[in-house]
Protein backbone atom coordinates (compact mmCIF):
# COMPACT_ATOMS: atom_id res chain seq x y z
CA UNK A 1 0.00 0.00 0.00
CA UNK A 2 3.00 2.31 0.47
CA UNK A 3 5.56 3.78 -1.89
CA UNK A 4 9.08 4.91 -0.98
CA UNK A 5 10.21 7.64 -3.35
CA UNK A 6 7.79 10.54 -3.88
CA UNK A 7 7.93 12.66 -7.02
CA UNK A 8 5.64 15.29 -8.51
CA UNK A 9 4.66 12.95 -11.36
CA UNK A 10 2.95 10.60 -8.88
CA UNK A 11 0.76 13.44 -7.62
CA UNK A 12 -0.01 14.50 -11.20
CA UNK A 13 -1.14 10.94 -12.03
CA UNK A 14 -3.51 10.80 -9.08
CA UNK A 15 -4.91 14.27 -9.74
CA UNK A 16 -5.90 13.17 -13.23
CA UNK A 17 -7.04 9.71 -12.08
CA UNK A 18 -9.52 11.11 -9.55
CA UNK A 19 -10.64 14.32 -11.26
CA UNK A 20 -14.04 14.64 -12.90
CA UNK A 21 -13.17 14.49 -16.64
CA UNK A 22 -13.99 11.92 -19.33
CA UNK A 23 -11.85 8.82 -19.87
CA UNK A 24 -10.42 9.86 -23.26
CA UNK A 25 -9.18 13.10 -21.74
CA UNK A 26 -7.64 11.17 -18.85
CA UNK A 27 -5.73 8.86 -21.21
CA UNK A 28 -4.35 11.88 -23.04
CA UNK A 29 -3.24 13.42 -19.73
CA UNK A 30 -1.59 10.16 -18.59
CA UNK A 31 0.42 10.08 -21.82
CA UNK A 32 1.53 13.69 -21.36
CA UNK A 33 2.58 13.03 -17.77
CA UNK A 34 4.55 9.96 -18.79
CA UNK A 35 6.26 11.86 -21.62
CA UNK A 36 7.28 14.61 -19.17
CA UNK A 37 8.56 11.95 -16.77
CA UNK A 38 10.76 10.44 -19.51
CA UNK A 39 12.09 13.88 -20.45
CA UNK A 40 12.91 14.54 -16.80
CA UNK A 41 15.35 11.64 -17.06
CA UNK A 42 15.31 10.35 -13.47
CA UNK A 43 13.94 6.83 -12.98
CA UNK A 44 11.33 6.40 -10.24
CA UNK A 45 10.18 2.79 -9.82
CA UNK A 46 7.20 3.83 -7.69
CA UNK A 47 5.91 6.17 -10.40
CA UNK A 48 6.25 3.49 -13.08
CA UNK A 49 4.45 0.91 -10.94
CA UNK A 50 1.59 3.30 -10.13
CA UNK A 51 1.36 4.36 -13.79
CA UNK A 52 1.06 0.73 -14.96
CA UNK A 53 -1.55 -0.04 -12.27
CA UNK A 54 -3.69 2.91 -13.34
CA UNK A 55 -3.41 2.17 -17.07
CA UNK A 56 -4.25 -1.53 -16.61
CA UNK A 57 -6.97 -0.96 -13.97
CA UNK A 58 -5.30 -3.07 -11.28
CA UNK A 59 -7.40 -3.72 -8.14
CA UNK A 60 -5.96 -4.39 -4.68
CA UNK A 61 -7.26 -5.61 -1.33
CA UNK A 62 -5.96 -4.04 1.87
CA UNK A 63 -4.66 -6.41 4.53
CA UNK A 64 -5.22 -6.10 8.29
CA UNK A 65 -1.99 -4.20 8.89
CA UNK A 66 -3.01 -1.64 6.25
CA UNK A 67 -6.42 -1.16 7.88
CA UNK A 68 -4.81 -0.81 11.30
CA UNK A 69 -2.61 1.98 9.96
CA UNK A 70 -5.48 3.77 8.22
CA UNK A 71 -7.72 3.54 11.29
CA UNK A 72 -5.73 6.36 12.88
CA UNK A 73 -7.15 8.72 10.27
CA UNK A 74 -10.79 7.77 10.77
CA UNK A 75 -13.24 10.59 10.15
CA UNK A 76 -10.76 13.04 8.64
CA UNK A 77 -11.24 14.64 5.25
CA UNK A 78 -7.97 13.80 3.50
CA UNK A 79 -6.84 15.31 0.22
CA UNK A 80 -4.68 13.62 -2.40
CA UNK A 81 -1.72 15.61 -1.05
CA UNK A 82 -2.49 14.47 2.52
CA UNK A 83 -2.44 10.80 1.49
CA UNK A 84 0.74 11.22 -0.55
CA UNK A 85 2.47 12.77 2.48
CA UNK A 86 1.69 9.45 4.19
CA UNK A 87 3.25 7.74 1.12
CA UNK A 88 0.06 5.81 0.38
CA UNK A 89 -0.62 4.39 -3.08
CA UNK A 90 -4.05 5.94 -3.22
CA UNK A 91 -5.57 3.60 -5.82
CA UNK A 92 -5.14 0.77 -3.31
CA UNK A 93 -8.02 2.37 -1.37
CA UNK A 94 -10.52 2.28 -4.25
CA UNK A 95 -12.17 -1.08 -3.59
CA UNK A 96 -12.33 -0.81 0.21
CA UNK A 97 -15.87 -0.35 1.63
CA UNK A 98 -14.57 1.68 4.61
CA UNK A 99 -13.15 4.47 2.43
CA UNK A 100 -15.36 7.04 0.74
CA UNK A 101 -14.59 9.65 -1.87
CA UNK A 102 -16.48 12.95 -1.80
CA UNK A 103 -16.03 16.45 -3.14
CA UNK A 104 -15.39 19.28 -0.68
CA UNK A 105 -17.55 21.74 -2.60
CA UNK A 106 -20.97 20.62 -3.80
CA UNK A 107 -23.67 22.39 -5.79
CA UNK A 108 -27.28 22.61 -4.65
CA UNK A 109 -29.90 24.54 -6.62
CA UNK A 110 -27.17 26.52 -8.41
CA UNK A 111 -25.55 27.49 -5.11
CA UNK A 112 -22.28 26.12 -3.76
CA UNK A 113 -21.75 24.70 -0.29
CA UNK A 114 -18.55 23.62 1.49
CA UNK A 115 -19.00 20.31 3.30
CA UNK A 116 -16.08 21.01 5.65
CA UNK A 117 -16.87 24.44 7.10
CA UNK A 118 -20.53 24.66 6.10
CA UNK A 119 -19.98 27.84 4.07
CA UNK A 120 -22.87 28.71 1.75
CA UNK A 121 -21.99 32.39 1.26
CA UNK A 122 -21.46 32.56 -2.50
CA UNK A 123 -19.11 35.52 -2.09
CA UNK A 124 -16.66 33.23 -0.26
CA UNK A 125 -16.23 30.84 -3.18
CA UNK A 126 -13.68 31.44 -5.93
CA UNK A 127 -13.96 29.91 -9.38
CA UNK A 128 -11.74 29.66 -12.43
CA UNK A 129 -11.60 27.59 -15.61
CA UNK A 130 -9.09 24.88 -16.37
CA UNK A 131 -9.61 24.37 -20.09
CA UNK A 132 -13.37 23.68 -20.23
CA UNK A 133 -13.82 22.71 -16.58
CA UNK A 134 -15.10 25.22 -14.01
CA UNK A 135 -13.29 24.67 -10.71
CA UNK A 136 -14.78 26.17 -7.54
CA UNK A 137 -13.10 26.20 -4.14
CA UNK A 138 -14.01 27.52 -0.69
CA UNK A 139 -12.07 30.53 0.55
CA UNK A 140 -13.46 30.55 4.10
CA UNK A 141 -11.59 27.43 5.25
CA UNK A 142 -8.61 27.78 2.88
CA UNK A 143 -6.15 27.93 5.81
CA UNK A 144 -6.98 24.26 6.50
CA UNK A 145 -6.15 23.21 2.94
CA UNK A 146 -8.08 23.68 -0.28
CA UNK A 147 -11.36 21.87 -0.94
CA UNK A 148 -13.07 22.13 -4.33
CA UNK A 149 -15.52 20.51 -6.74
CA UNK A 150 -12.80 18.94 -8.89
CA UNK A 151 -10.42 16.80 -6.80
CA UNK A 152 -12.13 14.48 -4.29
CA UNK A 153 -11.42 14.19 -0.58
CA UNK A 154 -11.07 10.78 1.05
CA UNK A 155 -12.74 9.77 4.29
CA UNK A 156 -11.74 6.64 6.20
CA UNK A 157 -14.35 5.02 8.44
CA UNK A 158 -12.99 1.73 9.80
CA UNK A 159 -14.97 0.32 12.78
CA UNK A 160 -13.38 0.71 16.22
CA UNK A 161 -14.65 -1.21 19.23
CA UNK A 162 -14.12 0.52 22.57
CA UNK A 163 -12.64 -1.46 25.42
CA UNK A 164 -15.18 -2.60 28.02
CA UNK A 165 -12.82 -2.85 31.00
CA UNK A 166 -13.04 0.87 31.73
CA UNK A 167 -13.42 1.85 35.37
CA UNK A 168 -16.20 4.38 35.94
CA UNK A 169 -14.97 7.55 37.68
CA UNK A 170 -15.80 7.75 41.37
CA UNK A 171 -15.86 11.55 41.40
CA UNK A 172 -18.16 13.00 44.07
CA UNK A 173 -20.66 15.46 42.62
CA UNK A 174 -22.70 18.16 44.33
CA UNK A 175 -26.49 17.89 44.15
CA UNK A 176 -26.64 20.44 41.35
CA UNK A 177 -23.85 18.71 39.43
CA UNK A 178 -25.57 15.34 39.83
CA UNK A 179 -28.90 16.67 38.55
CA UNK A 180 -27.18 18.34 35.59
CA UNK A 181 -25.22 15.18 34.78
CA UNK A 182 -28.36 13.02 34.71
CA UNK A 183 -30.30 15.53 32.62
CA UNK A 184 -27.44 15.78 30.14
CA UNK A 185 -27.47 12.00 29.60
CA UNK A 186 -31.27 12.06 29.12
CA UNK A 187 -31.06 14.96 26.66
CA UNK A 188 -28.38 13.20 24.65
CA UNK A 189 -30.46 10.02 24.40
CA UNK A 190 -33.31 12.17 23.10
CA UNK A 191 -31.05 13.89 20.56
CA UNK A 192 -31.35 17.30 22.23
CA UNK A 193 -28.58 19.84 21.74
CA UNK A 194 -27.78 21.13 25.22
CA UNK A 195 -26.02 24.07 26.84
CA UNK A 196 -24.57 23.55 30.32
CA UNK A 197 -24.53 27.14 31.58
CA UNK A 198 -22.46 27.03 34.73
CA UNK A 199 -20.42 29.61 36.60
CA UNK A 200 -16.63 29.34 36.77
CA UNK A 201 -15.70 26.74 39.38
CA UNK A 202 -19.01 24.85 39.11
CA UNK A 203 -17.24 21.72 37.87
CA UNK A 204 -18.44 21.57 34.26
CA UNK A 205 -15.92 18.89 33.31
CA UNK A 206 -17.12 16.48 36.01
CA UNK A 207 -20.70 17.00 34.83
CA UNK A 208 -19.92 15.36 31.47
CA UNK A 209 -18.21 12.31 33.02
CA UNK A 210 -21.41 10.24 33.10
CA UNK A 211 -22.18 11.14 29.49
CA UNK A 212 -18.66 10.22 28.35
CA UNK A 213 -18.76 6.91 30.24
CA UNK A 214 -22.21 5.95 28.91
CA UNK A 215 -21.23 6.91 25.36
CA UNK A 216 -17.96 4.99 25.41
CA UNK A 217 -19.68 1.89 26.82
CA UNK A 218 -22.28 2.15 24.02
CA UNK A 219 -19.46 2.39 21.46
CA UNK A 220 -20.44 5.92 20.47
CA UNK A 221 -17.91 8.21 18.86
CA UNK A 222 -17.49 11.16 21.19
CA UNK A 223 -15.29 14.23 20.97
CA UNK A 224 -14.47 16.88 23.54
CA UNK A 225 -13.26 20.00 21.75
CA UNK A 226 -11.73 23.12 23.31
CA UNK A 227 -10.42 26.31 21.66
CA UNK A 228 -7.12 26.36 23.62
CA UNK A 229 -4.46 23.64 23.42
CA UNK A 230 -3.41 24.22 27.06
CA UNK A 231 -6.86 23.08 28.17
CA UNK A 232 -6.70 20.09 25.80
CA UNK A 233 -3.55 18.93 27.59
CA UNK A 234 -5.11 19.54 30.99
CA UNK A 235 -8.30 17.63 30.14
CA UNK A 236 -6.32 14.75 28.67
CA UNK A 237 -4.45 14.42 31.97
CA UNK A 238 -7.68 14.59 34.00
CA UNK A 239 -9.60 12.08 31.89
CA UNK A 240 -6.64 9.69 31.78
CA UNK A 241 -6.47 9.79 35.58
CA UNK A 242 -10.21 9.51 36.27
CA UNK A 243 -11.15 7.03 33.50
CA UNK A 244 -8.74 4.20 34.15
CA UNK A 245 -8.53 1.81 31.21
CA UNK A 246 -9.84 4.36 28.69
CA UNK A 247 -7.60 5.07 25.71
CA UNK A 248 -7.84 8.65 24.46
CA UNK A 249 -6.96 10.25 21.14
CA UNK A 250 -5.42 13.70 21.67
CA UNK A 251 -5.00 16.30 18.93
CA UNK A 252 -3.69 19.85 19.03
CA UNK A 253 -1.13 21.97 17.19
CA UNK A 254 1.87 20.39 18.91
CA UNK A 255 0.71 16.78 19.17
CA UNK A 256 -1.43 14.23 17.38
CA UNK A 257 -1.61 10.91 19.19
CA UNK A 258 -4.02 8.29 17.83
CA UNK A 259 -5.08 5.15 19.69
CA UNK A 260 -7.69 2.43 19.16
CA UNK A 261 -10.54 4.35 20.77
CA UNK A 262 -13.69 6.28 19.89
CA UNK A 263 -12.99 9.04 22.44
CA UNK A 264 -11.15 12.16 21.28
CA UNK A 265 -9.95 15.34 23.00
CA UNK A 266 -8.85 18.06 20.57
CA UNK A 267 -8.78 21.75 19.76
CA UNK A 268 -11.63 23.22 17.73
CA UNK A 269 -9.08 23.85 14.95
CA UNK A 270 -8.63 20.07 14.66
CA UNK A 271 -12.38 19.36 14.84
CA UNK A 272 -13.07 21.16 11.56
CA UNK A 273 -11.02 18.51 9.75
CA UNK A 274 -13.58 15.80 10.63
CA UNK A 275 -16.72 15.20 8.58
CA UNK A 276 -19.93 13.50 9.76
CA UNK A 277 -17.98 11.25 12.08
CA UNK A 278 -18.89 11.93 15.72
CA UNK A 279 -22.11 10.88 17.45
CA UNK A 280 -21.57 13.43 20.23
CA UNK A 281 -19.45 16.59 20.27
CA UNK A 282 -18.89 18.47 23.52
CA UNK A 283 -17.43 21.97 23.10
CA UNK A 284 -15.96 23.44 26.27
CA UNK A 285 -15.19 27.16 26.67
CA UNK A 286 -17.54 27.82 23.77
CA UNK A 287 -17.30 31.53 24.59
CA UNK A 288 -13.50 31.61 24.25
CA UNK A 289 -11.17 32.85 21.51
CA UNK A 290 -10.49 31.67 18.84
CA UNK A 291 -13.72 29.61 18.56
CA UNK A 292 -16.22 32.29 19.55
CA UNK A 293 -17.09 34.58 16.66
CA UNK A 294 -15.26 32.47 14.06
CA UNK A 295 -18.02 31.20 11.76
CA UNK A 296 -15.63 28.78 10.09
CA UNK A 297 -14.90 26.99 13.38
CA UNK A 298 -18.47 27.27 14.68
CA UNK A 299 -20.11 25.79 11.59
CA UNK A 300 -17.25 23.35 11.05
CA UNK A 301 -18.12 21.80 14.42
CA UNK A 302 -21.59 21.02 13.07
CA UNK A 303 -20.09 19.36 9.99
CA UNK A 304 -18.12 16.97 12.21
CA UNK A 305 -21.34 15.44 13.57
CA UNK A 306 -23.27 12.57 12.07
CA UNK A 307 -26.61 13.98 10.91
CA UNK A 308 -29.21 14.44 13.66
CA UNK A 309 -26.69 13.69 16.39
CA UNK A 310 -25.89 15.73 19.48
CA UNK A 311 -23.91 18.86 20.28
CA UNK A 312 -23.20 19.89 23.89
CA UNK A 313 -21.88 23.33 24.84
CA UNK A 314 -20.18 24.17 28.15
CA UNK A 315 -19.86 27.82 29.11
CA UNK A 316 -19.99 30.33 31.94
CA UNK A 317 -20.81 33.20 29.57
CA UNK A 318 -22.72 31.85 26.54
CA UNK A 319 -23.67 34.13 23.67
CA UNK A 320 -27.24 34.73 22.50
CA UNK A 321 -26.37 32.72 19.39
CA UNK A 322 -25.48 29.64 21.45
CA UNK A 323 -28.52 30.00 23.71
CA UNK A 324 -30.85 30.25 20.72
CA UNK A 325 -29.31 27.22 18.97
CA UNK A 326 -29.76 24.59 21.69
CA UNK A 327 -32.90 22.66 22.64
CA UNK A 328 -32.30 22.80 26.39
CA UNK A 329 -30.26 24.85 28.87
CA UNK A 330 -29.02 23.37 32.15
CA UNK A 331 -28.04 26.09 34.63
CA UNK A 332 -25.71 25.87 37.63
CA UNK A 333 -25.52 29.29 39.35
CA UNK A 334 -23.08 28.44 42.17
CA UNK A 335 -19.67 26.81 42.45
CA UNK A 336 -19.01 23.24 43.55
CA UNK A 337 -18.42 24.14 47.22
CA UNK A 338 -21.61 26.20 47.33
CA UNK A 339 -20.01 29.63 47.67
CA UNK A 340 -21.06 32.47 45.42
CA UNK A 341 -18.67 33.90 42.86
CA UNK A 342 -16.48 36.73 44.13
CA UNK A 343 -17.58 40.12 42.83
CA UNK A 344 -14.76 42.21 41.32
CA UNK A 345 -13.98 45.50 43.07
CA UNK A 346 -12.66 48.49 41.17
CA UNK A 347 -9.82 50.60 42.59
CA UNK A 348 -8.71 53.86 40.99
CA UNK A 349 -4.95 54.37 40.85
CA UNK A 350 -2.53 56.74 39.18
CA UNK A 351 -1.88 55.63 35.59
CA UNK A 352 1.85 55.40 36.38
CA UNK A 353 1.02 52.45 38.61
CA UNK A 354 -0.28 50.58 35.58
CA UNK A 355 3.13 50.72 33.91
CA UNK A 356 4.76 49.87 37.24
CA UNK A 357 6.87 53.02 37.44
CA UNK A 358 5.35 54.13 40.73
CA UNK A 359 4.72 52.28 43.97
CA UNK A 360 1.07 51.47 44.71
CA UNK A 361 0.12 51.04 48.37
CA UNK A 362 -3.27 49.61 47.41
CA UNK A 363 -1.81 46.92 45.14
CA UNK A 364 1.08 46.11 47.50
CA UNK A 365 -1.23 45.69 50.48
CA UNK A 366 -3.59 43.42 48.58
CA UNK A 367 -0.83 41.20 47.18
CA UNK A 368 0.98 40.99 50.53
CA UNK A 369 -2.21 39.89 52.29
CA UNK A 370 -2.67 37.03 49.85
CA UNK A 371 0.96 35.91 50.05
CA UNK A 372 0.92 36.04 53.87
CA UNK A 373 -1.95 33.54 53.77
CA UNK A 374 0.32 31.20 51.75
CA UNK A 375 -2.00 31.43 48.77
CA UNK A 376 -1.08 31.52 45.09
CA UNK A 377 -1.76 34.65 43.07
CA UNK A 378 -2.49 35.06 39.37
CA UNK A 379 -2.25 38.56 37.88
CA UNK A 380 -3.46 39.39 34.37
CA UNK A 381 -2.03 42.28 32.36
CA UNK A 382 -3.44 43.63 29.07
CA UNK A 383 -0.26 43.49 26.96
CA UNK A 384 2.76 41.15 26.83
CA UNK A 385 5.25 44.00 27.34
CA UNK A 386 3.92 44.54 30.87
CA UNK A 387 4.83 41.01 32.06
CA UNK A 388 8.53 41.66 32.69
CA UNK A 389 7.78 45.10 34.17
CA UNK A 390 5.35 43.59 36.68
CA UNK A 391 7.82 40.86 37.62
CA UNK A 392 10.50 43.49 38.29
CA UNK A 393 8.03 45.56 40.31
CA UNK A 394 6.95 42.63 42.51
CA UNK A 395 10.54 41.61 43.20
CA UNK A 396 11.40 45.20 44.15
CA UNK A 397 8.38 46.14 46.27
CA UNK A 398 7.01 42.81 47.53
CA UNK A 399 9.79 40.25 47.94
CA UNK A 400 12.74 38.83 46.07
CA UNK A 401 12.39 35.54 47.93
CA UNK A 402 9.01 34.47 46.52
CA UNK A 403 8.82 32.59 43.23
CA UNK A 404 7.53 34.88 40.47
CA UNK A 405 7.17 33.99 36.81
CA UNK A 406 5.12 35.04 33.83
CA UNK A 407 3.82 33.38 30.69
CA UNK A 408 2.28 34.60 27.44
CA UNK A 409 1.04 33.15 24.15
CA UNK A 410 4.38 33.21 22.29
CA UNK A 411 6.51 32.10 25.25
CA UNK A 412 8.73 29.22 24.02
CA UNK A 413 8.67 27.73 27.54
CA UNK A 414 4.89 28.12 27.88
CA UNK A 415 4.04 24.41 28.23
CA UNK A 416 6.85 23.77 30.71
CA UNK A 417 5.79 26.72 32.88
CA UNK A 418 2.12 25.74 32.90
CA UNK A 419 2.40 21.97 33.15
CA UNK A 420 5.95 21.46 34.42
Regions of interest found by a model, annotated:
Residues 75-79, 92, 100-160:
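Interdomain "pre-motor" coupling segment immediately N-terminal to P-loop NTPase/helicase cores
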Residues 169-192:
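N-terminal pre-P-loop "Q-motif" helix
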Residues 197-205, 215, 220-235, 360-394:
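Conserved strand-helix element at the start of the C-terminal RecA-like helicase core
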Residues 233, 246-260, 403-420:
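Conserved helicase ATPase core of P-loop NTP-dependent helicases/translocases
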Residues 276-350, 358:
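Post-DEXD/H (motif II) to motif III coupling segment of the RecA-like Helicase ATP-binding lobe
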Amino acid sequence: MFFEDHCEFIEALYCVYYCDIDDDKKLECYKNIYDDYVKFGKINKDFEEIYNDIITGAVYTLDDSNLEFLKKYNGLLLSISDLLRLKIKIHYLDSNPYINKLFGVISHKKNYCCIRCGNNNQNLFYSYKNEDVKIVYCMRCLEFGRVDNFAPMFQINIPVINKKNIIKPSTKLSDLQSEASKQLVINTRNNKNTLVWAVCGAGKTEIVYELVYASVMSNKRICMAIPRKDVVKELYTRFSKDFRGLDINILHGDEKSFVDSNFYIMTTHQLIKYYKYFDIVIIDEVDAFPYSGDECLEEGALSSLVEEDVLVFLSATPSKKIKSYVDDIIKIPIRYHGYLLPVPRIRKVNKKVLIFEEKSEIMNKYISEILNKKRRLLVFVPVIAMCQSLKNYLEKYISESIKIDYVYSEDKDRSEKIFG
